[in-house]
């Protein structure tokens, strides 16, 4: 049934003891197409989202197909399947195993900026707060599953988070600052900033910049001070070099009051002429009625990964 069982989780399951025979619900083969490639092949209904059948779970998971297509997080599919088609062990536990809190947090950190871009929020039903920590309960995470290839990166056994990674090959597709791009992408913020440093922690890269001038802002307050620009992957795209001054155009995470530097953002070496152009472009954008917050997207934006019929533009 298992194609790899974490030793720690197995030991913890054994400590729980076997469920009484009368209460042990039957495990069933995973029939959800998106979850079949995952390292378990048996599940149990109802799942963690209270779907009584896998057919219901399939319909509910369809809304995430577009988000999965963006490759916003390597943990998203694992997390969704652990919620919608949870691992079931016949002998050791009468309740399906939940994903670890750290898995949820990594998936959310990578994909929530994409949802925000299309005026969606991370679903409350997938909140990370109530999920178990790696060292305080039985839970499952990708790095805990033993495979023939071994772990992709060393893990901290105390919390399930990585201690370090190998060099990640980043392929950034440059986006040139033009009026057409500016009007199409409708950035939340535009700043002139000097890069102080680029910090890397596990899969997260953060650029620390000193804001020199604010050309555009939206709902997140931007001080003329040192601020962090957050990414949603282990790559800094567009790339930034320390001690260089840039004009940076990006998006924001209103809920966490964060400025984001994600796919579709622009960073070019600062030139006074370019700064003046951007101010003119923004005036035109406001004249077109796009410079402020637009109505929310239709639900199809989440499913397809593209905006609906509202005026929100795509990158």
Curated annotation (Swiss-Prot):
Q: What is its main location?
A: secreted
- Report residue spans for region: Disordered: 284-315
The record's listing under PROSITE patterns reads:
FZ, NTR
GO cellular component terms, semicolon-separated: cytoplasm; extracellular space
Q: From which residue to which does the signal peptide run?
A: 1-21
Keyword match Signal: yes
Return one GO MF term: Wnt-protein binding
Concerning Pfam families, the annotation shows: Fz, NTR
Which InterPro entries does its entry note?
A: Frizzled/SFRP, Frizzled_dom, Frizzled_dom_sf, Netrin_domain, Netrin_module_non-TIMP, NTR_Sfrp3, SFRP3_CRD, TIMP-like_OB-fold
Q: Which keywords does UniProt give here?
A: Developmental protein, Differentiation, Disulfide bond, Glycoprotein, Secreted, Signal, Wnt signaling pathway
Give the protein name, as stated in the record: Secreted frizzled-related protein 3
């Amino acid at each position: 049934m298992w194609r790899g069982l974490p030793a720690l989780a197995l030991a913890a399951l054994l400590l729980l003891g076997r469920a009484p025979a009368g209460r042990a619900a039957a495990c069933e083969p995973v029939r959800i197409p998106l979850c079949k490639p995952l390292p378990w092949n048996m599940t149990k209904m109802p799942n963690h989202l209270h779907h009584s059948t896998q057919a219901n779970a399939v319909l509910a998971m369809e809304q995430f197909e577009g988000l999965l297509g963006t490759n916003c997080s390597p943990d998203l599919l694992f997390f969704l399947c652990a919620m919608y088609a949870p691992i079931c062990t016949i002998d050791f536990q009468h309740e399906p195993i939940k994903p670890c809190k750290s898995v949820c947090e990594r998936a959310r950190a990578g994909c929530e900026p994409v949802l925000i871009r299309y005026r969606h929020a991370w679903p409350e039903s997938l909140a990370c707060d109530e999920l178990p920590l790696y060292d305080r309960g039985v839970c499952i995470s990708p790095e805990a599953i033993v495979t023939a290839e071994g772990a992709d990166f060393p893990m901290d056994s105390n919390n399930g988070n990585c201690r370090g990674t190998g060099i990640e090959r980043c392929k950034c597709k440059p986006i040139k600052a033009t009026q057409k791009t500016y009007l199409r992408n409708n950035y939340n913020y535009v700043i002139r900033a000097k890069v102080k440093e680029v910090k890397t922690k596990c899969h997260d890269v953060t650029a620390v910049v000193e804001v020199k001038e604010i050309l555009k802002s939206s709902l997140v307050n931007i001080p003329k001070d040192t601020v962090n620009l957050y990414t949603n992957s282990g790559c800094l795209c567009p790339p930034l070099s320390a001690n260089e001054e840039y004009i940076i155009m990006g998006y924001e995470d209103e809920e966490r009051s964060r400025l984001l530097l994600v796919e579709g953002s622009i960073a070019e070496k600062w030139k006074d002429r370019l700064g003046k152009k951007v101010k003119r472009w923004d005036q035109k954008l406001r004249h077109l009625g796009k410079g402020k917050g637009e109505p929310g997207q239709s639900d199809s934006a989440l499913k397809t990964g593209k905006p609906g019929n509202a005026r929100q533009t795509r990158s």
